[in-house]
Amino acid sequence: MDSLKTKLGGCLLGVLTNRNGLIESFSLDSLRKVSVLGGYQIPTLEEVLQLVNGEVMLNIELKGDQTALLTHELITRYFDREGSQWKPERIFISSFDWDELKIFYEVNKEVPIAILTEDDPLDAIPIGLQLGAFAINPDFEKLTPEVVQKIHQSGFEIYPWTVNTSEDIERMKMLRVKGIITDFPDRINQTF
């Protein structure tokens, strides 16, 4: 379940739910009552880890303050759990909050990091290098052939967000990004 980050730093429930307001203002019990489009319930990260069990790559986006250490503790338990298929290379951590990424990197250098940015993608290169990130994930509208080339030359993969129209998906393929973040994976007629 995704949410919208406000300019003030809070996370709003998106238009795909039956509730409005800051996620931080809801208790876990209240969030359990939120209905996502199609009548689905919002899963906890722990429920997602149990369900997926390492069968696919998982992008965990840190969206709130003080989420880095809690996320590290939770995923580490799954790495160590008997019968778990989770390994550090099956998860990556991303965030627009670069301070949270720094905190995560201080305690866990095994799990890959991707830098999310809504500003000039080139501004993310220094923090990406500092944190040993594997990818920079910018707003797709900020990508040009020159920007893509500079990011690639700096050693990063690119997974732009949120690429939803068929035309934009094709443009990202032409720019030779590694993959995309989309709300409509069924619109992708071939893999990147």
Regions found by a protein language model. Name each.
Residues D2, K33-L45, P112-F192:
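C-terminal active-site rim and adjoining tail of enzyme catalytic domains
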Residues L4-V111, I115-D119, L131-F134, P138, ...:
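Metal-dependent phosphodiesterase/phospholipase catalytic core, i.e.
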